Swiss-Prot record:
This is ATP synthase subunit delta. F(1)F(0) ATP synthase produces ATP from ADP in the presence of a proton or sodium gradient. F-type ATPases consist of two structural domains, F(1) containing the extramembraneous catalytic core and F(0) containing the membrane proton channel, linked together by a central stalk and a peripheral stalk. During catalysis, ATP synthesis in the catalytic domain of F(1) is coupled via a rotary mechanism of the central stalk subunits to proton translocation. This protein is part of the stalk that links CF(0) to CF(1). It either transmits conformational changes from CF(0) to CF(1) or is implicated in proton conduction. Keywords: ATP synthesis, Cell inner membrane, Cell membrane, CF(1), Hydrogen ion transport, Ion transport, Membrane, Transport. The lineage of its organism: Bacteria, Pseudomonadati, Pseudomonadota, Betaproteobacteria, Burkholderiales. Its main location: membrane. F-type ATPases have 2 components, F(1) - the catalytic core - and F(0) - the membrane proton channel. F(1) has five subunits: alpha(3), beta(3), gamma(1), delta(1), epsilon(1). F(0) has three main subunits: a(1), b(2) and c(10-14). The alpha and beta chains form an alternating ring which encloses part of the gamma chain. F(1) is attached to F(0) by a central stalk formed by the gamma and epsilon chains, while a peripheral stalk is formed by the delta and b chains. It is a peripheral membrane protein. GO terms for molecular function: proton-transporting ATP synthase activity, rotational mechanism.
């Protein structure tokens, strides 16, 4: 996994430089879509098919995109296909997203809640977390009933776990240590 990230990083950084010089929002959508399409098993099979030429693979991939494709994006796909690295696109997209967040002073926040969290409670929680972390946060909410109550929040490497399950685990640890 680390090797994949290492190989994908220069592509993501170069792509980010090109995107910053143009329309970053449009590039973000395109790169995200490219990563999703490259992750589809059928597309992986097409990329690995020895009967198809590199131009055919690039053409099939580009035809699957719904977003407008710039000359630079076509060049990137051609380069990745030529080097048999089309499978790197999901990792390139992930690293591109991290670079964009860093340039905007933003971050993704993974919020796991025991119950569905939306509307005003979610907005209030995100606002509180933005003050704590000093960043604009983009929430991704999942529901995990095993938390019993409360939330588990992860921003980058930092985790805040205020769930009932975590508190019970702390109590168990304290009681068994005594």
């Amino acid at each position: 996994m680390a090797e994949l990230a290492t190989v994908a990083r220069p592509y993501a950084e170069a792509l980010f430089r090109v995107a910053k010089a143009g329309n970053l929002g449009a590039w973000s959508e395109l790169v995200s879509e490219m990563g999703q399409i490259a992750a589809v098993p059928d597309m992986k099979a097409v990329a690995d098919d020895p009967k198809l030429s590199k131009a055919d693979v690039a053409g099939i991939f580009l035809s699957a995109l719904k977003s407008p494709v710039s000359h630079e994006a076509k060049e990137l796909v051609g380069l990745l296909v030529a080097n048999k690295r089309l499978s790197l696109l999901p990792e390139i997209a992930a690293q591109f997203h991290v670079l964009r967040n860093a340039s905007e002073g933003a971050a993704d926040v993974e919020i796991t809640s025991a119950f569905p969290l939306e509307g005003a409670p979610l907005t209030d929680l995100v606002a509180t977390l933005e003050r704590k972390f000093g960043k604009k946060l983009q929430p991704h909410v999942t529901v995990d009933p095993s938390l019993i109550g409360g939330v588990r929040v992860q921003v980058g490497d930092e985790v805040l776990d205020t769930s009932v399950r975590a508190r019970l685990a702390q109590m168990q640890s304290a009681l068994t240590a005594a």
